[in-house]
Structures are given as structure tokens and as C-alpha cells.
């Protein structure tokens, strides 16, 4: 149509350029404010594209459960035969997994892998296989497997078949899967302190598991659960899990009445994704006793210098048969008398712990002064420093010490 108009204008002479421009504006709907009232200036620039806006359905969800999460994945799969934006959808789903509580669910990860089309991303020659055919899609699934590894979710053989159908045997996600299946079973049951999966929600049960793990350093240690309601003057009504061995009771009886004991903490121990606070009853190191020890004695718990008695080498000669031997509780920085975890982690509950230890076979603790030495929380101190407030210089005794006389109980 434009070519015919140009031919007519050439025959008629003047006004050709203005009329041709009018035809062009009519064909492109430009220059007409009625048909194009709000022209997009970015659309008129060469080299720019109008991309469709993507909506994140996971961020706007009201019911944040596993069923609603899987329902949104199914809606995306059934939306159209020719689906687009697979990578963006999977990344949005991975980002919002923690909000739905499905970051450790293998079924959900399988549903996300099933979003990818089957057969399209399989390389057909060695160049495509080595140079990462469809790199954006392959990296997306590799990031999904990486998140599974970070959350401790071990894949199964069904996931291998799914990756094989999507990316083929030479795909990089399948190589990542094989590496995970080689290492993760080795580390899954490597810990000598197995935990139930999932870990219990009861804080008392978690405290028992934590102290049992720490007290395995002495096989004769005994875990005892106290109730503060057994004491008349107890302020906090809570439970106390205490760990102590006969060797520690002996060290407590032999402890000098003139030297103080320290309740230090709270320290942290992690049981999977749960954190437990615990406290220690510690005494200063006995320098005279440590100086009398034979330097040639071998520490059976030291793994820094392990000698293997093979290949013609004589076994290491031990010097622990004669002389004084130190207990595993007697360290260079102090002697651990007992450890505990309480339901409230307050001074009142720790004071009740000392009274219960005295009433249950440790009467000598009532003749020894006890000091509280609480460590400050790191986040609170960091906020104080970043806020510009003046932080006083502190020494080793900077933590709050409070003298408690057991005779005044």
C-alpha cells in the first residue's frame, strides 16, 4: 500500500514526503493522540524490549502451608502447554520455602524439578555437553540441589530419573546429584551422637540430649533432672538438667574452701537447628598439681600427634604408668566441676542448682564461695558499639560477678 502511494505521489509531484509520513504514522498508530494517548518513550527507542511483568504468587499467599505451596506449583504447570519463565518461578519458589516451612521436604524439591520440560535441554553432542547446554536452566537446578545440600535433604533415586529426563546423562545437574549421593550418605550417620529426625520440640528433652552429648567425655557421668519446686525458697518454677560424674564429685570434695567456684555462661550448643544454653561450674586451674605432672605423659584425648604403630615402627612408649595423672576435667584453664541447663537460664535457677547439688551428695559446696560470671551477648554488644555509645574497657573479670555465700541460704 505504501509503495503504491509513493508511485502516485511521484506522478503528482509535491507533497510526497508529508503524505508518506502520514501513511507511516497511520500504519504504526503514531502521531495520533486519540489512538495512542500515552505513548511509551522507552518503546520508541531502538534495541529496547517490553518485557512482561512477573508476579510472585508465593509472596502474596495467605495460607502458608505445604499444600498451598504444592498447589501453586501445580497451577503453574497446568497454566499453559507452552510454559515460560521456568527459571524465574523456581528461584521465587526457592526463596520463599522457609516462609512455608518446606525447606527440608524432599517432595517439594521434586515438584520444582518437575516444572522443567522434559527432553528439551538434553545435549545432543559433546560440545553442548561440555559447554553447558542451556546454562541458565542448568544453573537453576544446580542451585536447587545446593539448597537441598545446605538444608541436609538427601535426594533419592527418583530424583535421579527426573534429572535424567530433563538434562540427560551428560547434564551438569546430574553430575551434581552424583556428587551429593557419594558424600551425603557418608556424612549422614557419621556423628557418634545420633539425633532423632526431626528433633523434639520439648526444651527439656533437647537439654537432656545436649548434656548427654557433652558428658560422654566421662562415661561414668550421670544426668539428673531436678525441679526447683523441691526447694522452699526457690523463685523460678522450672526444671534443671545437671550433669556430673563421680570424678567431678571427688574433685569438688578435694577443692580448697578458700578458693571460689564460678558459674559461667551461657554457652551454646547446637543440635541441628536448635540452640541450647548451658552453664558450667568451674574452678581455677590447680597450678601446683599441674606443675607436678610428668611432661612426657601422653594425653589420650589429644589427636594432634597420632602415631601409627605399623610399617616396622615400634609402638609409642607410654609414661602414664607411674606418677600423678590428671583427670579429663582438669584442663589448663580450669577444672570443670559440673554442667547444667535450666528452663529459664536465670540467676535464680542457677542458685537453685547449687542448692540442689548441695542437697544431693555434695555438702562441701556449701562451704565454698560461688561467683556468677555471666558473659555478655554478642548482638547486644555489637549494637552498642555500632550505635556510637562508649563501651568501657574490660578485663577478664568484666563479666558480672556476684558473690553468694552458701551459708546464708
Curated annotation (Swiss-Prot):
Ligase keyword on record: no
Keyword Nucleus applies: yes
Biased composition (Basic and acidic residues): 400-409
Transit peptide: 1-26
Keyword line: Cytoplasm, Immunity, Innate immunity, Mitochondrion, Nucleus, Transit peptide
Gene Ontology BP annotations: cell surface receptor protein serine/threonine kinase signaling pathway; innate immune response; mitochondrial respiratory chain complex I assembly; regulation of oxidoreductase activity; regulation of protein complex stability
Localization: Cytoplasm; Nucleus; Mitochondrion
CC per GO annotation: cytoplasm; mitochondrion; nucleus
Predominant subcellular localization, coarse grouping: cytoplasm
Disordered, as annotated region: 27-53, 383-409
Job description of the protein: As part of the MCIA complex, involved in the assembly of the mitochondrial complex I. Involved in the innate immune response; promotes the production of antibacterial peptides.
Protein family according to the UniProt entry: Belongs to the ECSIT family.
Quaternary structure, from the entry: Interacts with Traf6. Associates with mitochondrial complex I assembly intermediates during its biogenesis.
Protein name listed in UniProt: Evolutionarily conserved signaling intermediate in Toll pathway, mitochondrial
Source organism (scientific name): Drosophila melanogaster (Fruit fly)
Lineage, top ranks: Eukaryota, Metazoa, Ecdysozoa, Arthropoda, Hexapoda
Amino acid at each position: 500500500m505504501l509503495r503504491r502511494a509513493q508511485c502516485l505521489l511521484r506522478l503528482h509531484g509535491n507533497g510526497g514526503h508529508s503524505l508518506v509520513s502520514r501513511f507511516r504514522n497511520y500504519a504504526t498508530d503514531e502521531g495520533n493522540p486519540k489512538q495512542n494517548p500515552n505513548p511509551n518513550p522507552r518503546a520508541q527507542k531502538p534495541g529496547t524490549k517490553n518485557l512482561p511483568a512477573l508476579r510472585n504468587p508465593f509472596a502474596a499467599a495467605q495460607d502458608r502451608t505445604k499444600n498451598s505451596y504444592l498447589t501453586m506449583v501445580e497451577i503453574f504447570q497446568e497454566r499453559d502447554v507452552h510454559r515460560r519463565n521456568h527459571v524465574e518461578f523456581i528461584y521465587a519458589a526457592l526463596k520463599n520455602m522457609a516462609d512455608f516451612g518446606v525447606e527440608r521436604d524432599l517432595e517439594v524439591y521434586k515438584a520444582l524439578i518437575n516444572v522443567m520440560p522434559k527432553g528439551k535441554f538434553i545435549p545432543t553432542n559433546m560440545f553442548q555437553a561440555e559447554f553447558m547446554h542451556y546454562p541458565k536452566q542448568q544453573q537453576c537446578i544446580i542451585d536447587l540441589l545446593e539448597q537441598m545440600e545446605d538444608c541436609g535433604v538427601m535426594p533419592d533415586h527418583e530424583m535421579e530419573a527426573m534429572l535424567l529426563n530433563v538434562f540427560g546423562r551428560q547434564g551438569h545437574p546430574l553430575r551434581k546429584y552424583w556428587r551429593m549421593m557419594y558424600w551425603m550418605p557418608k556424612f549422614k550417620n557419621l556423628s557418634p551422637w545420633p539425633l532423632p529426625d526431626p528433633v523434639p520440640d520439648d526444651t527439656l528433652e533437647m537439654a537432656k540430649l545436649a548434656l548427654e552429648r557433652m558428658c560422654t567425655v566421662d562415661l561414668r557421668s550421670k544426668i539428673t533432672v531436678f525441679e526447683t519446686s523441691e526447694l522452699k525458697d526457690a523463685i523460678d518454677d522450672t526444671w534443671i538438667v545437671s550433669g556430673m560424674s563421680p570424678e567431678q564429685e571427688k574433685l569438688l570434695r578435694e577443692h580448697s574452701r578458700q578458693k571460689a567456684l564460678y558459674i559461667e555462661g551461657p554457652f551454646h550448643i547446637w543440635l541441628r537447628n536448635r540452640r541450647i544454653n548451658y552453664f558450667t561450674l568451674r574452678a581455677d586451674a590447680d597450678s601446683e598439681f599441674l606443675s607436678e605432672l610428668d611432661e612426657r605423659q601422653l594425653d589420650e584425648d589429644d589427636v594432634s600427634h597420632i602415631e601409627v604403630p605399623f610399617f616396622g615402627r615400634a609402638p609409642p612408649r607410654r609414661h602414664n604408668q607411674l606418677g600423678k595423672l590428671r583427670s579429663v576435667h582438669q584442663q589448663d584453664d580450669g577444672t570443670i566441676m559440673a554442667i547444667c541447663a535450666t528452663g529459664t537460664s536465670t540467676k535464680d535457677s542457677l542458685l537453685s542448682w547449687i542448692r540442689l547439688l548441695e542437697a544431693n551428695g555434695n555438702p562441701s559446696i556449701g562451704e565454698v564461695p560461688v561467683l556468677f560470671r555471666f558473659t555478655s551477648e554478642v548482638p547486644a554488644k555489637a549494637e552498642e558499639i555500632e550505635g556510637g555509645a562508649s563501651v568501657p574497657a574490660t578485663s577478664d573479670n568484666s563479666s558480672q560477678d556476684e558473690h553468694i555465700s552458701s551459708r546464708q541460704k
